[in-house]
Regions:
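Acidic, metal-coordinating helix/loop segments flanking the phosphotransfer/catalytic sites
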Residues: 37-57
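Short amphipathic alpha-helix used as the core "switch/output" element in two-component signaling
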Residues: 45, 71-83
Length: 129
């Protein structure tokens, strides 16, 4: 009798504030996600180069360390994986339009928002794998 391993989705969290990043990561890990975390869009772009098709969810802040912002990163991510669930967060107005299908969460958002999005993205991703 073979044992099957439950599907475990992977999320990319891009946030330069360590406390915010850690909170999101803990919530996602509690939702049975593998989590990759980055402080900058440039670091996240390297992750997307290797893993964009295996990601279920990306949550990014708009204001990040480095030269690229989270909206620009969202455009890159969705161009590499149109099925990726992308959430962009900010306490300010967006500097430019989001890519089609991306969601915007105004800060402060609730932990329940992360948990709901994680469940939705994981269910969607599991049906594609």
């Amino acid at each position: 009798m073979s044992q099957s391993t439950a599907f475990r989705a992977t999320a990319l969290v891009v946030e330069d504030d360590p406390m915010q990043r850690e909170m999101i990561c803990v919530l996602l890990e509690e939702s049975n996600y593998n989590v990759i975390q980055c402080e900058s869009a440039e670091a996240a772009e390297l992750v997307l180069d290797k893993f964009s098709n295996s990601l279920a969810l990306m949550i990014t802040d708009v204001s990040l360390a480095g030269r690229m912002n989270g909206v620009e990163l969202a455009h890159i991510a969705t161009s590499r994986n149109p099925q990726l669930d992308v959430v962009v967060t900010s306490g300010r107005a967006l500097p430019e339009p989001l890519p089609r299908g991306a969601k915007f969460w105004s800060k402060p958002w609730a932990a329940l928002d992360v948990l709901r999005e994680a469940e939705w993205a994981q269910t969607r991703s599991a049906t594609q794998h």
